[in-house]
Amino acid sequence: MYDVLIKNGMVFQSQQGTFEKKDLLIQDGLIAQPRDTMQHPQTVIDARGKYVLPGLIDEHLHLDLNGSMIGANGDTVCIPNCVTTACDGGTCGVSNFPQFYNSNIIRYEANVYAYLNVSTFGNKSLCLHEENHDPADFRPDLIERLFHKYPDTLRGLKVRMCRATLGNYGMAPLEQALKISAKLQEEGFHCPVVVHYDDLPKNVSVQQLFDAMRPGDIVAHIYQTKGETIFLEDGSIHPAVQQAKERGVILDDCHGRVHWSIPHLQAAVEKDFLPDIISSDTVRISEYVKPSFSLLHALSVFSAAGASTERLLQCVTINPARALGIEDRAGILMPGMPADIAILDIADTQMVFRDRYGNTAKGNKLFIPLLTMVGGRVAYRQIFF
């Protein structure tokens, strides 16, 4: 007997970026192969007129709730927003990642992965003097030890390239992170370098930063507005950024409240320069606080900027699954995959979206969470669904 039948829904084929009206069967926590004859399932969910997706993936947010001032609660920011898989964006380094793993990661309802911060203490608070980015203090020996201990959970190394962290170090922290990553990749670990790009100091340029990135590495906050941005004075995309994307560097919107503007999103959509990934970059002080407070809200803002629904949904399903190296367990709805499922309503809207600078955009599509299923179990459901 099947456990669950989700019927009549428009199922998102994330690899193709298309919808298909079909039923989904779930058995023992996995998506099941339909048979010609079958017994009536225990639970039937009628998704007529709704959209059935792989559980959404929030590839960059901060979830060290018990050990960091910036850590959000994964159970309140993920599950109600149809997020079944999340990756912590480097909140912790070698000195405190085990605490984060034991206190939060293994306890959250969603499947949580993490980037390891190259700074030993990670990013524990929002203050003037932030994490230590002296490359001499990065401790590659301890980083390697943690990758051996948590090979399935750790998905890369995080380094913040911004005025607040770099001081006079210039490109040295990124160069050291790339060396550590290369050694771990040689040992068979999935270990891209994830760069927080924002308000670069004068001794680091967009050209230098993007030229250093390798295929599979990730640049977060690509639509940020401080200092040198990805846009040249004439509004075109910086050639180094364009070339990085073409050679396989992964570009992450990494939304947050402060790392984007409506004009930047509109300019990117107009130039067909969408990100590979959209993530929420939620931190504790931004949980459900406007101008943007969740992954679904970020999708709605991008829709208001003119992006197509199908491409946006790939940015929160198959694309981050590939970037994290977990496409064998997330981001796709097919038999044998875990039954991590999102059901949404995608409604027309006249809602006006605002950024932190006061810019506005009239809404297009609103992404409304109806049901979240993790491992075949309903973890969240709207009262009217």
List each model region and its residues:
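C-terminal cap of metal-dependent C-N hydrolases
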Residues: G9, P338-F385
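Short, acidic/polar
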Residues: G67-T76, A136-F147, K202-L209
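Metal-associated gating/positioning segment near the N- to mid-region
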Residues: A47-R107
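Divalent metal-coordination and catalytic microenvironments
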Residues: G9, G29, G49, H60, ...
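Histidine-rich, glycine-flanked metal-binding segment
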Residues: M1-L53
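Active-site core of metal-dependent hydrolases
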Residues: M161-V289
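His/Asp/Glu-enriched, well-ordered alpha-helical/loop segment
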Residues: P263-D348
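Metal-cofactor-binding active-site regions of metalloenzymes
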Residues: N81-C87, T91-C92, R107-P135, K158-T165
